[in-house]
Amino acid sequence: MSGHSKWATTKHKKAVIDARRGKMFARLIKNIEVAARVGGGDPAGNPTLYDAIQKAKKSSVPNENIERARKRGAGEEAGGADWQTITYEGYAPNGVAVLIECLTDNRNRAASEVRVAMTRNGGTMADPGSVSYLFSRKSVVTCEKNGLTEDDILAAVLDAGAEEVEDLGDSFEIICEPTDLVAVRTALQDAGIDYDSAEAGFQPSVTVPLNADGAQKVMRLVDALEDSDDVQDVWTNADIPDEILAQIEE
């Protein structure tokens, strides 16, 4: 999970540095709208919606925006788009596998923007299934350390179905099966442990170690993909050492 964990950390820091708050808000709002449409507008009975709302609140999305997105998705307010989820597969430079998850109201536009971003930044598109087999669908819960140890986290979530806990330096990532996400999240709450986010993701079965040059190329490609309003998430199996991450972030 190290490749994903380090990359997720890097993406978060870069998002703040690059002032992409507007794009981040738009993605979080879309997640809420779609979750409400699929599973209903009551967060108490829709764990996916609950988690989408909590993540938006943690990211300082205004409550009014959150509530309007929930209402649009639930059909309580007009204006919701016909969002479609599409996953594209490809390879970044150095043979790094890439999964691109889009949430779009225009399939042709999404496909075009993904293809352009890939080809202009050294990537190649791949046939469905030729890359996704390198990843497993997992759920990821992140929480800040706040004086907690890995043993504290394990004690809280092990019986709830957690598979592993990753130490990211200033936070922990808890990996579990998607079906165990609610149980793990609830176990943390019962133990009085606050969490930052709980969401579905992809865990690579094999990672590709990168040097500084390779890391720069992969990050440039991912940045280009994330510039598209249709792209929700980009997952790679890149393994970028901490010292190289530090160089890139400077």
From Swiss-Prot:
GO terms for biological process: regulation of DNA-templated transcription. GO terms for cellular component: cytosol. The keyword DNA-binding applies. It comes from Mycolicibacterium paratuberculosis (strain ATCC BAA-968 / K-10). GO terms for molecular function: DNA binding. The keyword Cytoplasm applies. It is found in: Cytoplasm. HAMAP family: Transcrip_reg_TACO1. Belongs to the TACO1 family. This is Probable transcriptional regulatory protein MAP_1030. Keywords: Cytoplasm, DNA-binding, Transcription, Transcription regulation. Signal peptide: none annotated. Pfam families: TACO1_YebC_N (PF20772), Transcrip_reg (PF01709).
